[in-house]
């Protein structure tokens, strides 16, 4: 890192500490609440989302609850949703394939998937997901057959979306851990589908 980069990093850290101190001083939020929120955010990851998908694949009752009220269902698995927008879950099947996009910015289900991939926030992805979704998916190697409806789901500041992908053929008898290992962030956004290695 260069000296200007170091200076910028130090300045940003000082600003962050100052904001945190002001929020605590005004009793808006305590340092413990800030630390708690940071821990929750850092615990979220695509692996956590993969575990949610795997549970839905092996437990039909959980799958029903997940599709009915995603927020409540993921909380059953220990995912902390406090302070996060509600979570909706849509299911890919033989007749419909869902693709999640935030057309305005980068609203992403961070509570279950962690930080968004860089491309999810890009203007190119956001525009093409709406204008040319089949072309966009083809670039990811995901071909949605002509007979399958492609539904674009707009994730917003008020409501976040996640895709429950189709379980791949040939995974009968797999346990949850093995199933979770094949699920990627792209699968839960709808740009890719789970593949058996």
Model-predicted segments: where are they?
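Terminal, compositionally biased segments used for targeting/anchoring and flexible tails
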Residues: 1-197
């Amino acid at each position: 890192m260069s000296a200007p980069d170091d200076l910028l990093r130090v300045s940003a850290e000082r600003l962050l500490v100052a904001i945190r101190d002001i929020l605590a001083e005004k009793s808006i939020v305590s340092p413990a609440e800030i630390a708690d929120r940071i821990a929750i955010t850092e615990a979220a990851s695509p692996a956590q989302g993969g575990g949610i998908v795997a549970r839905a694949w092996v437990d039909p009752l959980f799958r029903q609850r997940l599709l009915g009220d995603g927020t409540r269902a993921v909380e059953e698995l220990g995912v902390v949703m406090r302070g996060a927008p509600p979570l909706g879950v849509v299911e890919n099947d033989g007749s419909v394939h869902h693709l999640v996009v935030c057309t305005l910015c980068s609203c992403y289900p961070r509570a279950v998937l962690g930080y968004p991939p860089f491309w999810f926030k890009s203007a190119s992805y956001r525009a093409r997901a709406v204008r040319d979704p089949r072309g966009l998916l083809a670039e990811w190697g995901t071909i949605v057959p002509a007979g399958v409806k492609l539904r674009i789901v707009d994730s917003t500041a008020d409501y976040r979306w996640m895709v429950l992908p189709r379980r791949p053929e040939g995974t009968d008898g797999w346990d949850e851990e093995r199933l979770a290992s094949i699920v990627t962030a792209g699968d839960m956004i709808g740009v890719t589908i789970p593949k058996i290695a």
